[in-house]
């Protein structure tokens, strides 16, 4: 973890490198605030599985997967710093013993039936270059 000043300097250096060398950077972090400031696209992963993908603004303003929604709701609100942070419920399963079906099903509050616990969801195109792997959105694809 970097202090805020060093973090800002490192991010500025990365942006300069991207501009100077016309390249991209894969930035791996849990800090969605930094993602919002620095990235054009975001891939949200859970237990090694891609669960949501799209332009940063679209995913942060309109998160679709319950895990992404939980991450967004866990961010501190600048207009109410006294408010308790919301945690994503449940315990993280072992990556060596992933749950069957959707990898998030043991922590999900939006289970839609047996499919969530038996079948891994496919990515569904929601438009605006935004995809989600969640059985909630299965109807969109059909």
Where are these regions (language model features)?
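Short catalytic/signature loops enriched in Gly
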Residues: 55-142
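P-loop NTP-binding/switch modules centered on Walker-like glycine-rich loops
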Residues: 2, 6-84
């Amino acid at each position: 973890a970097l202090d805020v000043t060093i973090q800002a300097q490192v991010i500025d250096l990365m942006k300069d490198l991207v501009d100077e060398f016309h390249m991209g950077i894969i930035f791996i972090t849990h800090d969605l605030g930094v993602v919002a400031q620095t990235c054009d696209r975001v891939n949200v992963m859970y237990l090694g599985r891609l669960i949501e993908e799209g332009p940063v603004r679209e995913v942060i303003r309109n998160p679709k997967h319950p895990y992404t929604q939980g991450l967004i709701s866990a961010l501190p609100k600048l207009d109410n710093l006294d408010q308790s942070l919301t945690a994503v419920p449940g315990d993280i399963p072992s990556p060596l013993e992933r749950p069957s079906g959707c990898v998030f099903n043991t922590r999900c509050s939006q289970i839609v039936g047996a499919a969530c616990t038996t079948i891994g969801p496919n990515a569904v195109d929601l438009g605006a270059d935004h995809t989600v792997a969640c059985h909630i959105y299965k109807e969109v694809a059909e």
